A protein has these predicted regions:
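Non-heme di-metal
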Residues: 1-190
Length: 190
């Protein structure tokens, strides 16, 4: 397509992998949902922290776009609205620990590899393109899955308000999609 946005959109749209979120929404058991939450806790209890390392590694419009996205991830100054706090609330409602690192020993190699990759991108300036590209891909592909994760929570029985973590992501990530794809990645490429 010739634009950063168009190229990113083509890349994420090309993924035709089976949707885990649809399985969770329609068929998963409570035990499967809880295992999913355990795996997600490795990242989501510190959500945004690794991507925030990109802020001092950027400048101009790219930096401003990342700060805007991260501010929302951190609840815009309200600690109860921080995405990590909402995920912790979900874990407690599902009868799981909200202690950061509490499930590292249960994490799969795939879970740890993903979290380690984000940390590596954030810690090394030379990987800032990978860091912002990862964030853009995440923001551009998460609205639908988060909607389905919320359906799974409501279907399987943790209190409905526990789905607030996923509902927040549906709303926020729809806004972040443009900011990450155009404002962040587009500005970095310029």
């Amino acid at each position: 397509s010739g634009t950063v946005w168009g190229d990113l959109r083509a890349l994420v749209d090309a993924d035709d992998g089976p949707p885990l979120s649809l399985h969770l929404a329609r068929w998963a058991t409570l035990a499967q949902l809880r295992e999913f939450l355990v795996q997600r806790s490795v990242y989501h209890l510190r959500e945004a922290d690794s991507h925030t390392w990109g802020i001092p590694r950027l400048s101009g419009r790219a930096k401003a776009a990342l700060v805007e996205i991260q501010s929302d991830e951190y609840g815009n100054g309200d600690d109860t609205r921080m995405h990590s706090a909402l995920f912790a609330q979900l874990l407690r409602a599902a009868g799981l620990s909200d202690t950061y690192g509490g499930y590292w020993h249960d994490a799969t190699a795939e879970t740890l590899a993903g979290v380690n990759a984000i940390s590596m991108f954030g810690l090394h300036r030379r990987h800032r393109g990978a860091l912002v590209g990862h964030l853009a891909a995440l923001e551009m592909t998460s609205t639908g899955p988060n909607r389905n994760y919320g359906k799974a929570v409501r279907r399987l029985g943790p209190p409905a308000e526990a789905a607030a973590s996923f509902a927040e992501h549906v709303e926020a990530d729809a806004v972040h999609e443009q900011g990450a794809g155009v404002g962040l990645c587009g500005a970095l490429v310029e």
